[in-house]
Amino acid sequence: MAAESIDAELRLGLPGSGGGDGVAAKKRRSASSTVKSEASGTACCGGAGARDVEDGASPASKVQVVGWPPVGSYRRSTFQSSSSSTAAAAKGKGGGETDQGRKNKGGGLYVKVSMDGAPYLRKVDLRMYGGYRELRDALDALFGCFSADASASAAHFAVAYEDKDGDLMLAGDVPWDMFISSCKKLRIMRGSEAR
């Protein structure tokens, strides 16, 4: 009766790793002994002669582990293909930097854009725009706050940005390249708050 209760006992742990059974523990080898035996050429299946791989052959390529969700590999392959096609196009055109080449150079510089009173945020790629005028037109298309129809309310909004230090500054006060390198967040705020 006691022997039957031991067989049906539930344990926490991996199957076959019972504490009372010394036979199963003796059959397993530690990782260090496995590495030592493979290095010396005495593998468990017949020694050095059992190896099918030639000494000069490279080992099998490792499969790259991707986190969950597997969006990272898709984005990485998309970025690599677009950057290689951009580089090939730049070499084909003589290396001169065109407007399209400037827009596609490097990765995207996405920043969050929030507007006072809007219950949603958007992200924009600052490298897509050549200056403040293009950025303002894009923000108008997203939020509709600077449109000509609402010319009276257009003066009530100002574009501010948060820089690397966390300071809130008005967009347009610094040159465009400096703005791109230091901008971390965009905020469309009411003109009364901007002053």
Curated annotation (Swiss-Prot):
GO terms for cellular component: nucleus. GO terms for biological process: auxin-activated signaling pathway; regulation of DNA-templated transcription; response to auxin. InterPro entries: AUX/IAA_dom (IPR033389), AUX_IAA (IPR003311), PB1-like (IPR053793). Residues 1-61, 85-107 are annotated as: Disordered. Residues 108-191 form the PB1 domain. Highly expressed in flowers. Expressed in etiolated seedlings. Keywords: Auxin signaling pathway, Nucleus, Repressor, Transcription, Transcription regulation. A motif (EAR-like (transcriptional repression)) lies at residues 10-14. Induction: By auxin. Aux/IAA proteins are short-lived transcriptional factors that function as repressors of early auxin response genes at low auxin concentrations. Belongs to the Aux/IAA family. Homodimers and heterodimers. This is Auxin-responsive protein IAA14. It comes from Oryza sativa subsp. japonica. The lineage of its organism: Eukaryota, Viridiplantae, Streptophyta, Embryophyta, Tracheophyta. The gene is IAA14.
